[in-house]
């Protein structure tokens, strides 16, 4: 694992180095909170840092990875053909940077003494009861590796447990649910994610929820614990026009359709299992 991490760091150079800044009270020994933030968007960190200070919440900054100048043809762990087959388009450099940043955040968490972590992107709005609700979710789902606390969509949610704080936790029969803007992960879950998601074949948010493929125990809340802020309207990855311009069309997209049908079948089985 150390050699693999070194390969990523060597390729991206200084851009992969993490900086961590804490605000508020000392981080909890049980649940830590991390915010991924690009150096060029430090104003976003200042905003969320201000929110955290007002709420008396401890959050730690993890520097995002700017992959805008990375050649994906030479990108470590990026499996181009598999990615195109699964997504119907090639990966965007910003998606690659996002993926690496989340993996780095998980390594930062594992280097701490915390038992679990809330990993967030810098376009969420913090809530005062975030850590308390996360603790209640862990208590209600002790076998969980990952629990998504924010999703773009929650369709055909099958409830597994209801927490003492009223959150409904379960799995969805339809997806992808989208977004890795806020999720809860345990230590064993972080170790599994680093191992199972090392090869990049899907955007990080989609890869994260594929427990049927990775062997992770992944759950989701029915109603978001946090919500996206106004900053989320300014995408740091790409706009819709960019996505449309690189999508495969016609017969070339048949393998993608087949992959998605299989994925839906496996998702349903996983959610009902």
What are these regions (language model features)?
Residues 2-3, 9-120, 124-273:
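An acidic/histidine-cluster motif and surrounding catalytic segment
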